[in-house]
């Protein structure tokens, strides 16, 4: 039986930290589903389709290199329900520090009550990515800062194009 993992997030935009977790997560499961959470109350910088494309473009070659399977999906609602819907028995989460740990351990407890068949696996962020967040990347890009240390080149191009569009329309 294949081990299926679900790596949830908004990936707006996908960062080098996300890619690090994807690379390491692919070594733990046979099939990793990168699941983009959709929240109707938020307006993302990148469209859902753009995020799918960037994840597939950046993570696809990593999966191929490792001989693993990767796919993308979207979900709204509870992560544990999305895991169940996709047949995942593992939810993969990256931890950047103590604040992430506190929040994520609460979520593990809640998820375990809702579905005891789904386990959560924490991967500590690598030292060179533990400070990266999508929120900070968007803020830096919006202030004309250099985001190249934090995101892959294709992501940088898409983010900068979108930020430029937004500035034109103001």
From Swiss-Prot:
Keywords of this entry: ATP-binding, Coenzyme A biosynthesis, Cytoplasm, Magnesium, Nucleotide-binding, Nucleotidyltransferase, Transferase
CDD domains: PPAT
SUPFAM superfamilies from the UniProt entry: Nucleotidylyl transferase
One Pfam family recorded for the sequence: CTP_transf_like
Amino acids binding substrate: 10, 42, 79, 93
Compartments reported by the entry: Cytoplasm
Entry function: Reversibly transfers an adenylyl group from ATP to 4'-phosphopantetheine, yielding dephospho-CoA (dPCoA) and pyrophosphate.
Protein known as: Phosphopantetheine adenylyltransferase
Organism listed in the record: Parvibaculum lavamentivorans (strain DS-1 / DSM 13023 / NCIMB 13966)
Gene: coaD
